[in-house]
């Protein structure tokens, strides 16, 4: 199960690699086995139910930014969704849809994890070489790869099985609309998204961990609230010195852990608007 409104995409050369400079890590610590809530709007909550399923009785609830959730170890498959049993914050146990949980990794520990550095370097290598197989290895096996042309535009989801063909598939996709207009952004990943990724990653961008970098814009550039518990890296190409102050671009990469291994879940673009 994926969030309502998410567009699901399922689709049946080489240059010199430029390393991205990331903060060094002193250690590779064991990640906590607790979970946190993701993909829930700041105005919403997750209902904890018993038994599992949307028809189960509500026994508790989780806030959109709830952390420290412990699983009992029991799970069940209901249709296309996996439900897991948790220890409810109000006591006892109950069930929630596993899509809305992520392994709870403290931000400071995340920013010191050397495996994340290696993950991002592999991602950049796959991007530079247009290598879908390499990209597949770094994408979240639980979710696939989710992209937003702009942070406020709808999500487009590439299933795990379709990521390997992301560079070669030319199917037209609706990526949302241009800011302040009804003009839809239509085209393939290769036509629309790839040039905008290369605009940032083929240079030596500014890099921050769990911190946004943005230039001049009429809309505040923010990491979406529904991803408050998801760690991220930001890569920023500033506007040219003495040039158009709106001509900048940032890509934020949301990273989650699956069985204690980091994977890329989300790519979100930020850019100047006039």
Give a label for each model feature.
Residues 94-100, 200-274:
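Short beta-strand edge/turn micro-motifs at domain boundaries
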């Amino acid at each position: 199960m994926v969030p309502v409104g998410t567009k699901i995409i399922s689709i049946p050369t080489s240059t010199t690699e430029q390393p991205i400079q990331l903060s060094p890590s002193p250690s590779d610590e064991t990640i906590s086995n607790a979970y946190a809530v993701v993909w829930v709007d700041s105005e919403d909550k997750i209902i904890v139910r018993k038994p599992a399923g949307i028809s189960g009785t509500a026994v508790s609830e989780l806030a959109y930014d709830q952390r420290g959730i412990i699983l009992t170890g029991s799970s069940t498959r209901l249709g296309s969704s996996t439900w897991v049993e948790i220890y409810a914050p109000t006591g006892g146990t109950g069930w929630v849809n596993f899509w809305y949980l992520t392994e709870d990794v403290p931000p400071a520990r995340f920013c010191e994890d050397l495996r994340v550095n290696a993950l991002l370097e592999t991602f950049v290598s796959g991007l530079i070489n247009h290598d879908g197989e390499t990209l597949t290895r770094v994408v979240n096996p639980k979710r696939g790869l989710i992209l937003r042309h702009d942070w406020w535009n709808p999500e487009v989801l590439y299933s795990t099985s379709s990521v390997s063909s992301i560079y070669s598939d030319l199917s037209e996709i609706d990526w949302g609309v241009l800011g302040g207009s009804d003009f839809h952004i239509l085209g393939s990943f290769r036509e629309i998204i790839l040039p905008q990724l290369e605009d940032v990653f083929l240079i030596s961008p500014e890099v921050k961990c769990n911190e946004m970098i943005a230039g001049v814009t009429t809309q505040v550039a923010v990491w979406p609230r529904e991803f408050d518990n998801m760690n991220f890296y930001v890569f920023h190409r500033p506007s040219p010195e003495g040039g158009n102050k709106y001509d900048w671009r940032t890509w934020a990469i949301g990273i989650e852990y699956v069985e204690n291994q980091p994977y890329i879940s989300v790519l979100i673009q930020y850019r100047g608007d006039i």
